[in-house]
Amino acid sequence: SSSLGVTSFGIRVFSTSSVSHVAIYLGENNVAEATGAGVQIVSLKKAMKHSDKLFVLRVPDLTPQQATEITAFANKIKDSGYNYRGIVEFIPFMVTRQMCSLNPFSEDFRQQCVSGLAKAQLSSVGEGDKKSWFCSEFVTDAFAKAGHPLTLAQSGWISPADLMHMRIGDVSAFKPETQLQYVGHLKPGIYIKAGRFVGLTQ
């Protein structure tokens, strides 16, 4: 998802992406997410209210038990802090990693290039030592904790755009362990493309 706020706009510009936020739908109209207020569980209505566009990707082979474990993880770390340090480190990384996306390079080389830059530029925190998360880090950790990792890359390396590109038929900067399935848009929103605003319905 994304919003029309300055923070969302900045993330989209630095990541050259149309999205700036990711969350997990837990069922029963509840959404788990990490925002500036920390890790929280909010209603779907509230999540939609602070998004100018919102679309849904599904993990096709997620089991009911894994879904339960994701919910348990979200409840366990609810009210934890937001990983501001990780976001500050992420800004220059989002800029320098663009060199790995040049057309002459193969997909494997691009993934190795981005991983190498991440190791050099981003901090590494042990899973048991974490006290805070940013949105895509939280989503990545939640699926990993449930035994259904989206990628084997460190969660602190993953941006909302990286998760979006793990959908079927797309190419992600990090090798996906699971290809996500596009379900549909809940809010079409406004997309930034070629220096202008355009509306999309799909």
Q: Which residues make up each language-model segment?
A:
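Cysteine-nucleophile amide-bond enzymes
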Residues: 1-202
